[in-house]
Amino acid sequence: MSTGGHVVAVTCLALEARIALGPGVSVICNHASKLVASLEAAVKQGASGIISFGIAGGLAPHLAAGDWVVGSRVRTEQGHFPTDYRWARTLVDALPGAVH
């Protein structure tokens, strides 16, 4: 994705949405049935990136609350889709201690 525009944070919980929302960040919260349409609209409106944002801590035993996890792919019922490598590297380099 390009470097201009805003980032869209996709969340499940209202608490996560409140944490993620800020300057340059819009939020799509708990819209599973409308997620694709909402993301397509955000891209048409100039979104430069999409992140999945959550506060769950049970991903792996070696992770603690507050750890940054940068994914390399997205898994859906339709298969696995790679994330943007350059953007992932930029995030890993910018976030202290990020796990990729």
Where are these regions (language model features)?
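Glycine-rich phosphate- or other oxyanion-binding loops that anchor nucleotides, phosphorylated ligands
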Residues: 2-100
